Regions:
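C-terminal catalytic "cap/lid" subdomain
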Residues: 1-212
Length: 212
């Protein structure tokens, strides 16, 4: 399930992370299966990470879009591509544990199939974040765009962005990046040292996202 063969060239390709799940969904869609069960090491999709919050509740159902949102924000139960394909092929997914198969998992389905939808579906936590703070930045058009363009050129995904209202020609700019991009980001930010009075980094943060 982790590799595929191109029909025209017969070349073997590795599908990458989540390839087995992706293959299962594709087969389920092709044979028009009622459901595709994905077995992991947890009983299903929880309202938040049960390893951090013991009172987290297992969800009976969640929509494709909400599952994709949780996954993009740090929840690591299901891989994004498998959920995207399930939505495209209209395949109902069930996430459940291979260690406790007697426990009903979580159904990932179309939103209209969920009769009683909670206001908040889940809370995603991402501890692999670094806050980059630029203080006393020259407040003129194009500075922020230049910074973010340089980061994008290095394939650094900038997430949360906060910029203060300019005072006396100066402004403060804060944004978050993945911890894995920290060292590369430092190299990029060195080019903008003259544009700010101070640049600092804080890796002791956690991003909390509410999905609903």
């Amino acid at each position: 399930g982790f590799q595929g063969v191109a029909l025209d060239t017969l070349r073997v390709s590795t599908l990458g992370r989540g390839g087995s799940d992706l293959t299962a969904v594709a087969i389920a869609g092709a044979i028009e299966a009622d459901v595709c069960e994905i077995y992991t090491d947890v009983d299903g999709i929880y309202t938040t990470d049960p390893r951090i919050e013991p009172k987290a509740k297992k969800l009976d159902k969640i929509s494709y879009d909400e599952m994709l949102e949780l996954a993009s924000l740090g929840a690591k139960v299901l891989q994004n591509r498998s959920v995207e394909m399930a939505k495209k092929l209209n395949v109902n997914l069930v996430s459940r544990s291979s260690f406790t198969p007697e426990v009903e998992g979580t159904l990932i389905t179309k939103e209209e199939n969920i009769m009683e939808k909670p206001i908040v579906s889940g809370i995603a936590l991402d501890k692999n974040q670094v806050r980059v703070g630029m203080y006393g930045v020259t407040d003129k058009p194009g500075i922020a765009a230049s910074i973010f363009t340089s980061l994008a050129d290095e394939n650094i995904n900038v997430d949360m962005i906060v910029q203060t209202v300019g005072v006396d020609g100066k402004t403060d700019l804060d944004f978050t990046i993945p911890t894995t991009d920290w060292e590369i980001c430092k190299g990029v930010m060195e080019k903008f040292q003259t544009q700010a009075e101070n640049i600092d980094y804080n890796e002791k943060i956690c991003k909390v996202s509410i999905v609903g």
